């Protein structure tokens, strides 16, 4: 907590001079007790939020690294996918030639019989 002038202890330990016709010291003490409780609550909440912020920043760093690693991995995949697709196309072409080539030979042979 930067630029904080008072801590809860400072508020508790603060003593005011008493003058005639001044404020009721009991009322001031009760009010300061409430201020101290609120101040401590805000300090705890601030600390909790800072810890959560640190945790989330670490998580962002981890996820950013994972994305960076994932991007390098995906650039390598299309090359392997392209070679796999080319291999599949070659096999399909050979299979078609074999199947349809045999049918063409059968059709030619049948045609000669008629």
From Swiss-Prot:
Intracellular or extracellular location(s): Cytoplasm
Keyword vocabulary terms for this entry: Cell cycle, Cell division, Cell shape, Coiled coil, Cytoplasm
Superkingdom, natural source: Bacteria
Record-level GO cellular component terms: cytoplasm
Chief location: cytoplasm
InterPro entries assigned: Cell_cycle_GpsB, DivIVA_domain, DivIVA_fam
Coiled-coil spans in chain: 32-69
GO biological process: cell division; regulation of cell shape
Gene3D superfamilies per record: 6.10.250.660
Task of the protein: Divisome component that associates with the complex late in its assembly, after the Z-ring is formed, and is dependent on DivIC and PBP2B for its recruitment to the divisome. Together with EzrA, is a key component of the system that regulates PBP1 localization during cell cycle progression. Its main role could be the removal of PBP1 from the cell pole after pole maturation is completed. Also contributes to the recruitment of PBP1 to the division complex. Not essential for septum formation.
Assembly and oligomerization: Forms polymers through the coiled coil domains. Interacts with PBP1, MreC and EzrA.
Family: Belongs to the GpsB family.
Stored HAMAP family: GpsB
Protein name: Cell cycle protein GpsB
Species this protein is from: Ligilactobacillus salivarius (strain UCC118) (Lactobacillus salivarius)
């Amino acid at each position: 907590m930067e630029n904080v002038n008072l801590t809860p202890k400072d508020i508790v330990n603060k003593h005011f001079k008493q003058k005639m016709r001044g404020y009721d010291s009991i009322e001031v003490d009760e009010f300061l007790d409430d201020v101290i409780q609120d101040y401590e609550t805000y300090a705890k909440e601030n600390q909790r939020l800072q810890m959560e912020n640190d945790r989330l920043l670490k998580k962002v760093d981890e996820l950013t690294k994972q994305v960076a690693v994932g991007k390098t991995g995906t650039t390598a995949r299309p090359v392997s996918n392209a070679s796999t697709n080319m291999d599949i196309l070659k096999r399909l072409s050979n299979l078609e030639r074999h199947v349809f080539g045999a049918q063409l030979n059968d059709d030619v042979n049948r045609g000669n019989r008629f």
